[in-house]
């Protein structure tokens, strides 16, 4: 372990020195630094993309850092199970056995959040018992009708592995953890001989007033939209359609005076969840006027057009382009491929702004 840790530390030191060198050089050549904002409504996948940047372009997560996420994974599972249990009454779904119903009541009263380093054995037994009930799984399938983390099904289907002694979260486990972003989270990395300063800002309504402090000298912004949330409502008010809220927010961002010269990339995220959902939940939940087929190709193209139509930016007589990518933030290979293409766009637009392209 000592050898592994020293190699990880050495890699981190080398990257840190390279970042320090580029920061020093940046005083002479500002084009070497790319300031990138991640914007979007809450739960659109911004924080997951930021984690991917660390995995792809930095040292990733050491064994010790992965252990720290154990409590977060446990907490996410317990919150998800509690949410499903509470939703069953609202959805009029019954437990299949009285024992499972009794265990569910015990689980709700258990005095832990799960954010400890180990799960009590009694809690593990209750969680597995409750998850085995077909009523719980029916309620999970109807998660659009209440508030539930996207990761719930992923974690619950792997309870045996996650609840095993000495469990250490995998990279995929970490990518799916849900921690509400408050304030501004920054990460730095070097890619294609550029220093990237990436800022993830909270997406909930209460957090958006903090965005203004990031607007100065922005090279590019990535606006994230969760495709799969077209039939869901906001956590904040339980009435407003989430995609309608994202459209309104995107309108205010892409046509903002701060971003007239800024490269804007639209990430239509959670395409995997959208592809599963669209065949059983029509797009008319969000767009009553939609007359196309409820399949991935037509429905995703329609959503893309709705967002791109919001763009009113012009420079002189020329419309400023929006660059759209369909993404799955939990798929490292997809994000690696997409970010490579996006980086070329950002560098090209930055050179053009400086009159060098």
Curated annotation (Swiss-Prot):
<dbReference type="GO" id="GO:0046872">
    <property type="term" value="F:metal ion binding"/>
</dbReference>
<feature type="binding site">
    <location>
        <position position="329"/>
    </location>
    <ligand>
        <name>GTP</name>
    </ligand>
</feature>
<feature type="region of interest" description="G4 motif">
    <location>
        <begin position="265"/>
        <end position="272"/>
    </location>
</feature>
<dbReference type="GO" id="GO:0031683">
    <property type="term" value="F:G-protein beta/gamma-subunit complex binding"/>
</dbReference>
<comment type="subunit">
    <text>G proteins are composed of 3 units; alpha, beta and gamma. The alpha chain contains the guanine nucleotide binding site.</text>
</comment>
<dbReference type="GO" id="GO:0051301">
    <property type="term" value="P:cell division"/>
</dbReference>
<dbReference type="GO" id="GO:0000578">
    <property type="term" value="P:embryonic axis specification"/>
</dbReference>
<keyword id="KW-0479">Metal-binding</keyword>
<keyword id="KW-0131">Cell cycle</keyword>
<dbReference type="GO" id="GO:0001664">
    <property type="term" value="F:G protein-coupled receptor binding"/>
</dbReference>
<comment type="similarity">
    <text>Belongs to the G-alpha family.</text>
</comment>
<feature type="region of interest" description="G3 motif">
    <location>
        <begin position="196"/>
        <end position="205"/>
    </location>
</feature>
<feature type="binding site">
    <location>
        <begin position="269"/>
        <end position="272"/>
    </location>
    <ligand>
        <name>GTP</name>
    </ligand>
</feature>
<dbReference type="GO" id="GO:0005525">
    <property type="term" value="F:GTP binding"/>
</dbReference>
<dbReference type="InterPro" id="IPR011025">
    <property type="entry name" value="GproteinA_insert"/>
</dbReference>
<protein>
    <recommendedName>
        <fullName>Guanine nucleotide-binding protein alpha-16 subunit</fullName>
    </recommendedName>
</protein>
<feature type="lipid moiety-binding region" description="N-myristoyl glycine">
    <location>
        <position position="2"/>
    </location>
</feature>
<keyword id="KW-0519">Myristate</keyword>
<dbReference type="GO" id="GO:0005834">
    <property type="term" value="C:heterotrimeric G-protein complex"/>
</dbReference>
<feature type="binding site">
    <location>
        <begin position="40"/>
        <end position="47"/>
    </location>
    <ligand>
        <name>GTP</name>
    </ligand>
</feature>
<feature type="region of interest" description="G2 motif">
    <location>
        <begin position="173"/>
        <end position="181"/>
    </location>
</feature>
<feature type="binding site">
    <location>
        <begin position="200"/>
        <end position="204"/>
    </location>
    <ligand>
        <name>GTP</name>
    </ligand>
</feature>
<dbReference type="InterPro" id="IPR001408">
    <property type="entry name" value="Gprotein_alpha_I"/>
</dbReference>
<dbReference type="GO" id="GO:0019003">
    <property type="term" value="F:GDP binding"/>
</dbReference>
<feature type="lipid moiety-binding region" description="S-palmitoyl cysteine">
    <location>
        <position position="3"/>
    </location>
</feature>
<comment type="function">
    <text>Guanine nucleotide-binding proteins (G proteins) are involved as modulators or transducers in various transmembrane signaling systems. In the 1-cell embryo, probably together with goa-1, controls nuclear rotation and spindle elongation during mitosis. During the first embryonic cell divisons, plays a role in gpr-1/2 cortical localization and in the proper orientation of EMS blastomere mitotic spindle.</text>
</comment>
<dbReference type="InterPro" id="IPR027417">
    <property type="entry name" value="P-loop_NTPase"/>
</dbReference>
<feature type="binding site">
    <location>
        <position position="47"/>
    </location>
    <ligand>
        <name>Mg(2+)</name>
    </ligand>
</feature>
<feature type="binding site">
    <location>
        <position position="181"/>
    </location>
    <ligand>
        <name>Mg(2+)</name>
    </ligand>
</feature>
<keyword id="KW-0498">Mitosis</keyword>
<feature type="region of interest" description="G5 motif">
    <location>
        <begin position="327"/>
        <end position="332"/>
    </location>
</feature>
<keyword id="KW-0547">Nucleotide-binding</keyword>
<dbReference type="InterPro" id="IPR001019">
    <property type="entry name" value="Gprotein_alpha_su"/>
</dbReference>
<dbReference type="Pfam" id="PF00503">
    <property type="entry name" value="G-alpha"/>
</dbReference>
<keyword id="KW-0132">Cell division</keyword>
<feature type="binding site">
    <location>
        <begin position="175"/>
        <end position="181"/>
    </location>
    <ligand>
        <name>GTP</name>
    </ligand>
</feature>
<feature type="region of interest" description="G1 motif">
    <location>
        <begin position="35"/>
        <end position="48"/>
    </location>
</feature>
<keyword id="KW-0449">Lipoprotein</keyword>
<keyword id="KW-0342">GTP-binding</keyword>
<keyword id="KW-0807">Transducer</keyword>
<dbReference type="GO" id="GO:0003924">
    <property type="term" value="F:GTPase activity"/>
</dbReference>
<dbReference type="GO" id="GO:0007188">
    <property type="term" value="P:adenylate cyclase-modulating G protein-coupled receptor signaling pathway"/>
</dbReference>
């Amino acid at each position: 372990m000592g050898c592994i840790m020293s190699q990880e530390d050495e890699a981190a030191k080398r990257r840190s020195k390279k970042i320090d060198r580029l920061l020093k050089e940046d005083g002479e050549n500002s084009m070497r630094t790319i300031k990138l904002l991640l914007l979007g409504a809450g739960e659109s996948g911004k924080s997951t993309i930021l984690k991917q940047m660390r995995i792809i372009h930095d040292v990733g997560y050491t064994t010790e850092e992965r252990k720290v996420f154990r409590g977060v994974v446990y907490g996410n599972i317990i919150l998800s199970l509690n949410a499903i249990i509470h939703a069953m009454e609202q959805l009029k779904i019954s437990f299949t056995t009285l024992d499972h119903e009794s265990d569910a009541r015990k689980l709700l009263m258990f005095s832990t959040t799960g954010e400890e380093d180990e799960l009590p054995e009694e809690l593990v037994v209750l969680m597995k018992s409750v998850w085995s009930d077909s009523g719980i799984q029916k309620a999970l399938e109807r998660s659009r009708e209440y508030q539930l983390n996207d990761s719930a099904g992923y974690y619950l289907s792997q309870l045996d592995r996650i609840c095993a002694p000495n469990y250490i979260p995998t990279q995929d486990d970490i990518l799916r953890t849900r921690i509400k972003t408050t304030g501004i989270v920054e990460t730095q990395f070097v890619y294609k001989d550029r220093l990237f300063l990436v800022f993830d800002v909270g997406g909930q309504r209460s957090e958006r007033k903090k965005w203004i402090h990031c607007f100065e000298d922005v090279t590019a912004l990535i606006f994230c939209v969760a495709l799969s949330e077209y039939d869901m409502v906001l956590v904040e008010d339980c009435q407003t359609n989430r995609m309608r809220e994202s459209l309104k927010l995107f309108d205010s961002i892409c046509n903002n005076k701060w971003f007239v010269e800024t490269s804007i990339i639209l990430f239509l995220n959670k395409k995997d969840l959208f592809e599963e959902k669209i065949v059983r939940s029509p797009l008319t939940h969000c767009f009553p006027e939609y007359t196309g087929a409820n399949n991935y190709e037509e429905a995703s193209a329609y959503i893309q057009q709705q967002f791109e139509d919001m763009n009113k930016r012009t420079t002189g007589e020329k419309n400023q382009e929006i660059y759209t990518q369909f993404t799955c933030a939990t798929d490292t290979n997809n994000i690696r491929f997409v970010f490579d293409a996006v980086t070329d766009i950002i560098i090209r637009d930055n050179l053009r702004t400086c009159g060098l392209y």
